[in-house]
């Protein structure tokens, strides 16, 4: 067969092998799962933290297992599901966008997959699960010269939040709760200056653009 035919056959064989391996091994949540969900503009989210967790969990990058990162130091709890979008990475493109929007220099991505908060009506108390989420906006957060965006999304088909398409449709109190959590969850009671700052709240269009930048960074 011609070279193009052999290449197509090898590509098909590789896809078949990957499909077979999923029957025996769990896919790595960062690298082994597609970012996009079945509906356009919706994304898979791997949940690392719920509003019920007094312990911070995160994915071990080497193994893909969920691990205990640390107990939450203080009493504040994340008001939403919290996790990341697979096959994303906050690198050069994400950092450049943050620098452009803030007019600052020397901003770089934080070297992690893009973070995402998912609003739900029903309580979900399990970590290490996948949900489909629709981004509606985000918080531009900077942590020690690192772009650490927090995408805000709603659970797909959620009865209370699923119809929302813009962060500006949310009650302002919910946005304030998210801002307060991220500004204070690392603060001790004696500290007054947050180690992070939130410079902007942005809408769905920019959230989707930042996700695309994080996908570009992942594939570099």
Predicted regions and their residues:
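Hydrophobic N-terminal alpha-helices or hydrophobic patches in metabolic proteins across all domains
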Residues: 1-220
